[in-house]
């Protein structure tokens, strides 16, 4: 399941705790609790998230308060009903102990070799760009450069030899929790119209509350400047939470723009209601208008842009290179991440059916299937926290031909799915420990590119002769 970025460095160091050496019994107990309750969000392996800042204190009492009460609006659940005071105190001790060991877990201590072997294919990581923070979206320009959107709100033009130029004119974003500047895609006719699309967490103030939502901005790229900016989509309603934005985009073969929107942490009200935009996949014309043949467009009580519903938080989306279908992957809670094909008017079941459980170990539902609700092509137990995905149809990777590659945020590897039609028949984990793998794309040059969070790398997967 996706790590909840709560803005407080408490969550960061929470992540670090899982790989501490058991120096005393209390650490062992706390570590077991971490693995049971925390690792599905915060990751299996220790990570020094250098962009996090302490907001709620570093003393034991302050940490215990954070663990006990959580930050629900930011996606951090409360644990006072699951862990007793002694266990919470031990977990706080583990966090404090982990601070002494942060440096040894930084990116530099990752595997020193940049060559990785798998069944049928060996690749070398070539560094294309670094120090990008959290590179979320990748889009390839006709001249060979790529546009990179980073969660902080910065946009870069990146060349093949680590050249990096900042692009001006991007949207104003709320870079809190899981929000920020997220995906970027080019219009299918970009060479003619220069249109670029950005998904992001838009922000507005209502009284003393700061609210946000998933929004799409279209703009023209002129050199290194964005012009003619227009917001073409805002998911309604805005929410006070800071997680589950979804935000992936893809164009299909007919030129429709598909957009994923998470349920913003309100699974009881949003994903099963077609009266709001949350927990949905939307289909739009390229200028934001609603297609006349969308499934609910004639229902006066429904949101016309909805194409499918019952989603939790889809953070991977692509067009199948052969069939043209839109595929997504989706974060489950504690277990139950999914791979789906988006179908017109379909209900994907969240939270009525689910293969996972809640973070505190309690069941969300006793159903994994129900008539009228879609089943995933595959699901993951435990959660891998899937993000970007890419089909391999390039002759540069004959050993992976036809495979589906998916980035894992939790386990920090590239998941390879061997496909027979729409069926996953085998899986393999690649690039182990490379980092939180946010995105993967196959470029027009036939090479695969991956983005890794913190300190923010983009690598080209260079095939090695075997």
Task: Label the predicted regions.
Residues 1-28, 86, 119-120, 129, ...:
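N-terminal export/targeting leaders of redox proteins
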Residues 24-44, 61-69, 129:
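Sequence/structural segment immediately N-terminal to covalent heme-attachment motifs in c-type
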Residues 29, 34-40, 45, 75, ...:
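Short pre-active-site segment immediately N-terminal to redox-active cysteine/selenocysteine motifs
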Residues 40, 48-101, 180-181:
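Extracytoplasmic electron-transfer domains, predominantly the class I c-type cytochrome c fold
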Residues 87-90, 95-260, 264-267, 316-319, ...:
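Acidic, Gly/Ser/Thr-rich repeat motifs that build Ca2+-stabilized beta-propeller blades
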Residues 165-179, 229-244, 286-307, 351-381:
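Surface-exposed loop and turn segments in beta-propeller and other repeat-based domains
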Residues 213-223, 274-287, 342-343:
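Beta-propeller blade signature
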Residues 311, 424-444:
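Conserved blade-ending motifs and adjacent loop-strand segments that build the rim/top face
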